[in-house]
Amino acid sequence: MKQQLKALMGEGARRRLRRLGRLRWITKAGVLRRHEVRLRTSPATWLRYVLLDPEVDTFTYRLDNVDELVAVLAAQTGLPAAQLAAHAREVETDEELTRGLARRTRRRLDVKRRLHPVGHHLAAWVLVRARRPALVVEAGVLDGLASLVVLRALERNAQEGAPGRLVSLDVMPGAGSLVAPHLRERWTLHVADSRTGIPAAVGEERVDLFVSDSLPDSAHVRAELDAVLARAAPTLDVIQVWGQLDALHDVGRELGVPVTVFRERPRGHFYPGNRIALARLRDDGRSAP
């Protein structure tokens, strides 16, 4: 029934409803019930979330196992773990991702006072900062926290002499509201289905990094991966977020490359954490661009 109602509402109405996140008390009580958090046993957690937290379906939190993610990325890229760990620490102190984002969202009811990039955001930041890609492609935008993270990493790269850009696809008009205006000059957002929209969005360019956060559907993700592989740069890294991870595993087996699944350990949050799959589907033999 819930999925049927969502379909009837349409993307625009759903986006407007999400803007009332802090006021959706009944919905949030249901979220806690699904995660077995009860008022009588965990009153502080229950009340804090229901009364104050705006997030009802996509959660943000600090991670307790960033070191594990860094180890996965070091194994995938061949780059020193110390270098990747230093890039991971940049996220916590970056002006745009901390105070800048807080200033822009202070009047919004659907955004936390401090947003912490989660597993796939952090993985994307580290790969962009370390690899300095010319082109990143993202399928699935929603409010655009991942887009913001990638664009800020690209901006820092450009300031260091290594420019790049982001191409994103989402079916929802108005997606990406968290992205600051000054970061949009290196961003192209297509309102299109990623399964069919990637070829036109990428054109003759080559993809260095692909982030799939669209639908938890294996056939959908497989179509995205096939489109990206046809336009892959000599070195292509892929991050697949949540849901069915079968598609990336299937491609990995076909290409004979390893696919690693990272499971988040959230700090101080009732959500048990997401799973992301990471792989290097093309490799020209160099660990750095």
Task: Explain the meaning of each model-derived region.
Residues 51-53, 64, 77-116, 129-131:
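Class I SAM-dependent transferase core
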Residues 112-115, 121-289:
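S-adenosylmethionine/decaboxylated-SAM
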Residues 1-74:
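Membrane-proximal basic amphipathic "stem/tether" segments
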Residues 4, 85, 274-276:
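Short, intrinsically disordered, low-complexity terminal segments
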Residues 27, 75-84, 104-111, 180-184, ...:
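Short, mixed-charge, low-aromatic patches
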Residues 34-36, 85-92, 166, 191-194:
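Short acidic/polar alpha-helix capping motifs at helix-coil junctions
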Residues 4, 8, 50, 72-76, ...:
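Residues that form generic nucleotide/phosphate-binding pockets
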